[in-house]
Amino acid sequence: MNWELYSSPLRVFWRSKVWDEKTSTFTSDENLKIGKMVGKRRRPRPKRSIDLEDSTEQLISGDMVTFPCSVCYRELNKARNFLHKKHHNALSMLGFQWMGGRQPKPKLVSLHRECIISNLLRSSTYNEKVLHNVNYAFEFLWKKQVPSYFKLCDKVGETSTYSPNSNHLMIKGIAICSNNNSAWKAEPNCKFTVVNDFGDKANVCFFGLFDSHYGYAAADLASKEFQVLLLHQLSIQDPSYQMTAEQKQLINSFDTVFREEYRAREEAFSSTYKTFRTSRREYEDTHKAFAKAFWRMDRLLRLGRNETSRVRWSGCSALTCILEGGIKNPHANKDWEKTYQQGSTSLPFQKTPQIISGVLHLANAGNVQAVLCRNGKGFCLTKEHSTRNTKERRRVLYSEAVISSDDPYGLLDGHIKTTRGLGFHGNLRLKKSIIPAPQTISVPIDDLCQFLILATNGLWQVLDKKEVTALVITLFHAYKETHVPRPKSKPWPPIGLLSPPDSNIRVLFQYQPENEDIMSTADGTKGLSDSIYAEAYTHQGTFSPKVTPYDPCSTKENSSLPTIDSKQENEKELCIKNFYKGAAEYIGCELVSAAIEGGSRDSITVMVMFLNGSEYHRLT
């Protein structure tokens, strides 16, 4: 497969011993040097046998897995990522450009430092922290040894893994991996939630991450009660969402909190949002439900339940998602599959029914972010609400808040970087700036969408979306090579039969688009129409008997007796599920390890979710 055809910056390599045994086809300086030393004989080294256990040990160590740096596109492994990023920061601080890995001359480094310090002392905006950063960068480039304050602690605790079962049509495997990063954090501060058949609806899954600040009470309550608040709002707008008796009792217990005057303010809050990039209004109610659920969850945290501090109560950043899936007009799809299996070589594309796999709704407030990989390209679906965001800085400064200079991007009132979230009611001045208004967005999910990554700030402060996407693809290749049995990649049709696949995603509905460069989007009129025929063709192997009970359009149950073919198909589906679940666990742990080795100073929680697109050649 030629990776350069669709994503040249995301070229990934996995250097194994088998590759080292092959002769390189590229001309290099090493080949020229070998040619000059023909007269010298070297004793041949005994070849070491390669077995599966040895390869798995190397795979687990992570040294053989590389990914490209998003700045210079140089191949890095996890161990080199930390110092490599420090090298980039030091060069940038002293005014140097990337020199292809070459070190600038010491005299030139000294001259740059003296010039920067001289200009800094003469300026009216003198900052002691900038002076320290210049000196640190100078020491990093001047000294051959790494300064002691750059080194990491070896013991960071164990990574816990949780793999919930999912019967969703579009989810192949899911895993949540978490590490407290005990070198910097004393206790765990992240909670997660995964709910299958959300609202008693098939192929509707709710999942979310809640990263706490100043304690775990807010994140713990939000992980338990937010889904109930959201389900209540959705059930009001759509009766197909059903609530259990226990959930209704919980909602009724909050009647004394949500009175009429509060509901009037809530309605005004949810109606002030502006729509963006869409004329499809059917998702507006879903986004209003998210907004009201965030507002109500923040009001419940104001009660101070389970809070232990008398000075400052806890808060949390939240990322919540609803994945709706299904097959449109499934009976027509089965007829088309039957016609194709009878030996027909021509495909009537004009009569092929349109298949829409599903829609992903997201709502985030804070610094928990999500990246969707579609056709080998990563898209950030969330917006970071922190002092790093220029518009967020402008908003909090307009609310008479103070941003200190204790951090490269400042701290809100000298305490925290986050500018939106749930809770933070202990400090009234801080709460005035930290609002529970979420950023919401809806995007279509089709068979070109390969995986979804949800992670807390501990991962994103070390790796960006391009590096995470490339690393996940590389790790998936490595896992596939060392684990047998593995599912076979489904064949793609000849290129001439299909339109060029669109690598972008289309925004179906979005509130408050304050950052235009957060995501690349296709033309609204074009959308996903280029890949409709590709979807119809690639679904030829997905119409198994197991899919029938989960079909939302079908009202009949499959009452036929199980056959040998159906049993084999069920065993095959179970094997595939186990494979993707294991891959999600392995990749999640490796992402956590990469963040820790990259110098993360926060706890890390990563949710890895493989979608239908991971079955095809674009990823496998």
From Swiss-Prot:
Residue ranges constituting the PPM-type phosphatase domain according to the UniProt record: 173-611
GO molecular-function terms, A-Z: protein serine/threonine phosphatase activity
Coiled-coil ranges per UniProt: none
Short name of any one Pfam family annotated for the protein: PP2C
CDD domains: PP2Cc
InterPro entries the UniProt entry points to: PP2C, PPM-type-like_dom_sf, PPM-type_phosphatase-like_dom
Family statement drawn from the similarity comment of this UniProt entry: Belongs to the PP2C family.
PANTHER family in alphabetical order: PROTEIN PHOSPHATASE 2C, PROTEIN PHOSPHATASE 2C-LIKE DOMAIN-CONTAINING PROTEIN 1
UniProt protein name: Protein phosphatase 2C-like domain-containing protein 1
Organism: Mus musculus (Mouse)
Lineage per the UniProt record: Eukaryota, Metazoa, Chordata, Craniata, Vertebrata
